[in-house]
C-alpha cells in the first residue's frame, strides 16, 4: 500500500510539473507583450507636415526652431514619440522632423554648435535635437533623457 501511495504521488507530481513546464514555455513564446508596437512617426500629421531634408536644416523661414532627428528603428525615439509630437502641436517654438533613415545625416560624437553651413553639421545619433537660431545651430542635444529635459525646459520658457 505504501508503494502504491508513493507511485500515485509521483504521478501527480510529474503531471503538475508537466503542466507548469507547458505553461512556462507557452508564456515565454508569446509575442503579445515581448516587443512593444509603436506607431510610425508618419502616422502623425504634424510629422508629415513638418518633415524636412538634411540640406534644409538651416534655411527654414522661422528665426528660431528645433529639428527632431529620429529613426523608425530607434526604440528610444519611439519611447519619446508622444512627448515630441505633443510638443510640436502645443508649443509655439516650431518643430521640424527629420528621419535619418531617409537622409544621409552625418553622425559624429562631437556635438558641434555655432555651425552655419549644413555640410559642417552633424548629430550624435538618434534621438537628437538641433536648436537653430538665425540660421545657426545653437544647441545639439542627443539621447532620450537630454532630449526630454530640453523639451520640458523649452515648454516652460514658451508658456
Residue positions per predicted region:
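C-terminal motif of bacterial Sec signal peptides marking the signal peptidase cleavage site
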Residues: 24-27
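Structural alpha/beta surface segment adjacent to cysteine/selenocysteine redox centers
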Residues: 106-126, 130-136
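Bacterial N-terminal signal peptides that target proteins for export
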Residues: 4-16
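Local sequence-structure signature of Cys/Sec-based thiol-disulfide redox active-site neighborhoods
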Residues: 53-96
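Thiol-based oxidoreductase modules, predominantly thioredoxin-like and allied folds used
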Residues: 93-112
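N-terminal leader/targeting and pre-domain segments
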Residues: 29-63, 152-159
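Non-catalytic, surface beta->alpha helical segment in thiol-disulfide oxidoreductase systems
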Residues: 124-159
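Solvent-exposed loop/turn segments at secondary-structure junctions
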Residues: 72-76, 102-105, 136-137
Amino acid at each position: 500500500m505504501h508503494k502504491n501511495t508513493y507511485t500515485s504521488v509521483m504521478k501527480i507530481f510529474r503531471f503538475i510539473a508537466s503542466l507548469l513546464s507547458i505553461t512556462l514555455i507557452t508564456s515565454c513564446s508569446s509575442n503579445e507583450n515581448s516587443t512593444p508596437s509603436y506607431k510610425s512617426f508618419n502616422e502623425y500629421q504634424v510629422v508629415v507636415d513638418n518633415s524636412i531634408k538634411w540640406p534644409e536644416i538651416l534655411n527654414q523661414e522661422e528665426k528660431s526652431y528645433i529639428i527632431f532627428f529620429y529613426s523608425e528603428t530607434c526604440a528610444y525615439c519611439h519611447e519619446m514619440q508622444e512627448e515630441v509630437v505633443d510638443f510640436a502641436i502645443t508649443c509655439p517654438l516650431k518643430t521640424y522632423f527629420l528621419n535619418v533613415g531617409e537622409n544621409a545625416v552625418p553622425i559624429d560624437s562631437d556635438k558641434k554648435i555655432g555651425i552655419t553651413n549644413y555640410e559642417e553639421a552633424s548629430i550624435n545619433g538618434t534621438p537628437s535635437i538641433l536648436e537653430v537660431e538665425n540660421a545657426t545651430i545653437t544647441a545639439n542635444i542627443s539621447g532620450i533623457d537630454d532630449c526630454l529635459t530640453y523639451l520640458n525646459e523649452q515648454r516652460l520658457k514658451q508658456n
